[in-house]
Amino acid sequence: MASALEQFVNSVRQLSAQGQMTQLCELINKSGELLAKNLSHLDTVLGALDVQEHSLGVLAVLFVKFSMPSIPDFETLFSQVQLFISTCNGEHIRYATDTFAGLCHQLTNALVERKQPLRGISILRQAIDKMQMNTNQLTSIHADLCQLCLLAKCFKPALPYLDVDMMDICKENGAYDAKHFLCYYYYGGMIYTGLKNFERALYFYEQAITTPAMAVSHIMLESYKKYILVSLILLGKVQQLPKYTSQIVGRFIKPLSNAYHELAQVYSTNKPSELRNLVNKHSETFTRDNNMGLVKQCLSSLYKKNIQRLTKTFLTLSLQDMASRVQLSGPQEAEKYVLHMIEDGEIFASINQKDGMVCFHDNPEKYNNPAMLHNIDQEMLKCIELDERLKAMDQEITVNPQFVQKSMGSQEDDSGTKPSSYS
């Protein structure tokens, strides 16, 4: 090894042994150029460092190896990164979260390029667990994990990181970017959409759309299109966005989504034939946006919505009559819809196979069983937890020096007095 590299290894060992992590972070930030100039010796450097004891030094070397324009031996580097993430010291890498997250981004990009997303899923799950201070903390690696799960069509590994409500963001030494936040909620919404958990999907798309913004984001635009479609499938109408939504949405994003607004407008007429005509008219747009599958589900949900409307008018109805009223092709298709809706708990009915009559029933749920009481208890606990969280956040803001300074300034402006100077 060159003398400069030997000095780097010795410094990493010494600072790690002394527990001087801040100084070690400064060293690895300055050593990028040195390591890049000595690519052929980097595996020797890795051999001289212990992953557990010298995690930050190993991280610096792997980051530089992955930063090179071309990777000569990807399989070796992949194995090195896999071993590092599974065995590194979590307390150490939290001093260099920006570099650690950067390494995960590089790994993700390399696997996406090679069309091997499945290989990175378990590695990124380990990386998130190492980096998080708590399970409610969002990191930029969350977006990478969701991206790989989507590309691999393997959604379930991401669910433990989506089902929790995020209360905090890992700043990553200033490297956390709004793009990571938007991608987490956009990809998360797509995963929930794929699993037909439309309620949670709608919430995730809403988070992406309502992110404070001063410019148009393509991620926000795509989230908005899916938000409209999922709203129609879940609620039968487009759910109104919160008042705090950025003006960017109304001014720029809505005009770029005209086909989707037309779809929502025609959907509200409850006429499937007109909706089919509009889908055919804008099929190129929907296909280009990769939303044709959701659009077809909108059409299917309109049939279901119209069947639900019949339950408020009729006690019994023949399948033939239902098919003509709802504009289905015939009694067989009507029966298929009714059976699926009964199975999903969307209507309460029974079909008499002898005469093809559908009998609609009242909701059998009396809301007095132990399971329902347990659900109510769980919802109450969530409300209590939310109240405690809000109180803690309020207290945190109250003692924040910037908030106190602004509050004092506004009070002085209101009273017309000038701030006093103390010596």
UniProtKB/Swiss-Prot annotation:
Residues 197-365 form the PCI domain. The keyword Cytoplasm applies. It comes from the Eukaryota. Its main location: cytoplasm. One of its GO terms (biological process) is protein deneddylation. The keyword Nucleus applies. It is found in: Cytoplasm; Nucleus. GO terms for cellular component: COP9 signalosome; cytosol; nucleoplasm; perinuclear region of cytoplasm. Pfam families: COP9_hel_rpt, CSN3-like_C, PCI. Residues 402-423 are annotated as: Disordered. Gene3D superfamilies: 1.25.40.570. Keywords: Cytoplasm, Nucleus, Signalosome. SMART domains: PINT (SM00088). InterPro entries: COP9_N, CSN3, CSN3_C, PCI_dom, WH_DNA-bd_sf. Component of the COP9 signalosome complex (CSN), a complex involved in various cellular and developmental processes. The CSN complex is an essential regulator of the ubiquitin (Ubl) conjugation pathway by mediating the deneddylation of the cullin subunits of E3 ligase complexes, leading to modify the Ubl ligase activity. Belongs to the CSN3 family. Component of the CSN complex, probably composed of COPS1, COPS2, COPS3, COPS4, COPS5, COPS6, COPS7, COPS8 and COPS9. This is COP9 signalosome complex subunit 3. It comes from Gallus gallus (Chicken).
